[in-house]
């Protein structure tokens, strides 16, 4: 299956699994997807992730979602920059998600990072997604 936007596929799979209260979700692997999942893990929205499979074509990300009782750690996740409409911001214009309670995942010249890291490094870039 050919995907025009693999990042949106990642976000939708996590969102759907989260809404259905699944413990884990399986996602086709790519280095960029793995970097995004790593940031989500570091921010505390998922419990863990692992890379399954040995061949490049068989690799999958196995993401374990995080719950506190019946409440999910992820309240919402939204794709911002899309292939048809890219969203770029300068370092001074980086938005705060829910007044700082959420996280903005950005692709910068220094790699993928959160909004807090981008402000600290004083770099702008493309806004990939919001998560809260």
From Swiss-Prot:
HAMAP family the UniProt entry points to: Ribosomal_uS8_B
Q: Does the keyword Ribosomal protein apply?
A: yes
Any GO CC annotation of this UniProt entry: ribonucleoprotein complex
Quaternary structure per UniProt? Part of the 30S ribosomal subunit. Contacts proteins S5 and S12.
To which species is this protein native?
A: Mycoplasmopsis synoviae (strain 53) (Mycoplasma synoviae)
**NCBIfam families on file:** PRK00136.1
> What gene codes for this chain?
rpsH
This protein's source sits in the domain of life called Bacteria
Q: What name does UniProt use for this protein? A: Small ribosomal subunit protein uS8
Function according to Swiss-Prot or TrEMBL? One of the primary rRNA binding proteins, it binds directly to 16S rRNA central domain where it helps coordinate assembly of the platform of the 30S subunit.
Which molecular-function annotations from GO does this UniProt entry contain?
A: rRNA binding; structural constituent of ribosome
